[in-house]
Amino acid sequence: MKTSTTLALSLLAMAQPSLAQAQDATAPTLSAPFGECALGQWTSNRNLDDSAEITSAGCLVSWKPKLNANMQLGLNARAGWQDQGVTSGASGRVREAYVEFDAEPFSLRAGRQIIAWGRADRINPIDSLSPRDFTLLVPDDEQQRNGIDAVRLRYAINPALSITAVVAKSDFNVTPQASLPPNLVLAESPRDTEWALKLDRSGSGVDWSVSYFDGLSRAVRYRVDFTNPRAPLFRGDFERMQKLGADFAIAQGAWTIRGEVAHARISPSCTACASDARRVTSAVLGGDVDFAETMNFNVQVFANLKEDFTDPAGLTGVREALTLGLNRLNTDYAARETGLTLRLSDRILNDKLRWEISAVLDLNGNSRAVRPRLTYAFNDHLRLTAGLDHFEGPSQSYFGALIKNSTAFAIVSWVF
């Protein structure tokens, strides 16, 4: 971590002459906050606990005032009632709170911020920094993202090519808790220092990036502790991950081809764990096309190759039951996981009505997710959204394990 910290400080020192020029400030531009407040009805929460008929309310507010020509604040916060599966009643979180200095060719952002990497459609193997809250009752997956405390420095080599360095404190996903076994011990969440680098080319017919991340995995990794053979425990720990990744997007007329690939070396961070590292390779390849003026169709294939998968076939008794349970906790169902994503969307009635239907097919486990969405804008402020998350498949499969999270919803929201 000393090397990464030295790198960030060196880049910051290089930026000092440019940042000094920013002191010729103009008057601040205190723009008004913007966001959305919503009232929703859901047939289930997202905590895997069979809860039904939930009324939720929440607001997502952003404010990005410019202090002068080179400095801007970024604030984004969420507050809600019954809108988070792991919390009953009121909940809230500051998702972003940062200050940004922009003095070309440097851009420096410090504070809590959402950092999203990857050009594929919603499945992004290289996206390792910002965690998600998978229990939030929101129709858009992007609203699940949470910020991390970080310093991000970007240097524009030329108008199309840039290099970005990030030094951050680790934070982790919020996941459903109701399905966790009672004999589980979870380690305390560490606050380790992490770093990442990305070389990015954008703004041309062929966009691409190469990135590297060294930090903690955002998901807990579970193992079985046989210290007491008569009462084995599940233990959840956080793993150190080094990940090398790349992505690309090629646009030609109405067509866009996208892809991502990442190779991760993941090792246990707990002293009592086995020392062997495991390796995971993930890839996505697909594309989308615009047609009939307002419609879009997207298709992708994806694959995950896992070195350390434990196949329960051939095991019996307690060992088989524990292995099946462990694989469900870690969402490990095959050494080679393959799947397909589909998405069709359209805008009609002068963009007042927007609909989308998306599906994810788990080809190994024969499970699937279907997620239609419909949004109607009465005017610039009032909006109605309805949708469905339907999961099905065997219990020992990715979407079969999420059946209790199947839900239908209707949301009335006010945009300001």
Regions found by a protein language model. Name each.
Residues 340-344, 388-390, 402-416:
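Outer-membrane beta-barrel "beta-signal"
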Residues 23-47, 55, 69-75, 355-357:
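Transmembrane beta-strand segments of Gram-negative outer membrane beta-barrel proteins
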